[in-house]
């Protein structure tokens, strides 16, 4: 999988500062303006899966005799550049920056407000 990604002409891995469990807002695409929690990050592909966003329907055929087919709805991935961290307290989106606090621990904070995330 990694080899196939490297073979793509303009493949560039971006630095993803979004982690699983973060609340994000979609800033581009058909789901623009919606917010949701990050379920999964795929750093090698620069993609994230967000709960309740970019839903796809999948038709599953019956695999055994007597079983009925069904329609599943699941979240598809979004490119990481199309989402931005969302702060519930301040009700705004912001970029994330890393910093080292007084104890020498690396933490994340919002660039706009300086609010420490973790």
Curated annotation (Swiss-Prot):
InterPro entries assigned to the protein according to its UniProt record, in alphabetical order: KOW, Rib_uL2_dom2, Ribosomal_uL24, Ribosomal_uL24_CS, Ribosomal_uL24_KOW, Translation_prot_SH3-like_sf
Lineage start: Bacteria, Bacillati, Cyanobacteriota, Cyanophyceae, Synechococcales
Family: Belongs to the universal ribosomal protein uL24 family.
Record's subunit section: Part of the 50S ribosomal subunit.
Keyword Phosphoprotein: no
Natural source organism: Prochlorococcus marinus (strain MIT 9301)
HAMAP family: Ribosomal_uL24_B
Domain of life from the UniProt record: Bacteria
GO biological process: translation
Gene, per the UniProt record: rplX
Pfam families (alphabetical): KOW (PF00467), ribosomal_L24 (PF17136)
Protein name: Large ribosomal subunit protein uL24
GO cellular component, one term: ribosome
Keyword list, A-Z: Ribonucleoprotein, Ribosomal protein, RNA-binding, rRNA-binding
GO molecular function: rRNA binding; structural constituent of ribosome
SMART domains found in the cross-reference section: KOW
Function: One of two assembly initiator proteins, it binds directly to the 5'-end of the 23S rRNA, where it nucleates assembly of the 50S subunit.
